Amino acid sequence: MFRGTSYHRIDPKGRIVIPSRFRDLIGADGTAMITFFEGGLYAYTLEEWSKIEAKMVMLEKKGNQMRRFRRFFIGRASECQPDKQWRLLIPPELRQDAGLEEEIVLIGISDHFEIWSRAKWEEQKNLHEDDMNDEDFQNEIEKLGL
């Protein structure tokens, strides 16, 4: 499972270094499927990506919104393989959409990891703090036993 937060820099060529704790999870060849979602990049192992694609087939029948979601989530994904230094080259369009410039944050989220610009990550942290002040949300968290 992907866990933890790492602060890094994206180099001028658009490469990011995969943290060592993520490398074994990605697999021997290190290939990751990366797509844009909710303002950041989501990176999946090929195994997890196959599961997502299988689920997405059903979205075709659920109307225009779901069809568009599938089109952009799957259609914009890019298969990225690291070099010998475990650097992934993020395609320019994905870098631009996610606002990746210099400082980035990698966050492990169980079945995938996310790549955020430092500025957008700070915004997400602020939203989380706001969520934690919401009584209904706090009740949902309590139901999880946390």
UniProtKB/Swiss-Prot annotation:
It comes from the Bacteria. One of its GO terms (molecular function) is transcription cis-regulatory region binding. PANTHER family: TRANSCRIPTIONAL REGULATOR MRAZ. One of its GO terms (cellular component) is cytoplasm. GO terms for biological process: negative regulation of DNA-templated transcription initiation. Residues 5-48, 77-120 form the SpoVT-AbrB domain. InterPro entries: MraZ, MraZ_C, MraZ_dom, MraZ_N, MraZ_sf, SpoVT-AbrB_dom, SpoVT-AbrB_sf. It holds the Pfam family MraZ. CDD domains: MraZ_C, MraZ_N. This is Transcriptional regulator MraZ. Belongs to the MraZ family. Gene3D superfamilies: Transcriptional regulator MraZ domain. Its main location: cytoplasm. It is found in: Cytoplasm, Nucleoid. Keywords: Cytoplasm, DNA-binding, Repeat, Transcription, Transcription regulation. NCBIfam families: division/cell wall cluster transcriptional repressor MraZ. Forms oligomers. The keyword Signal does not apply.
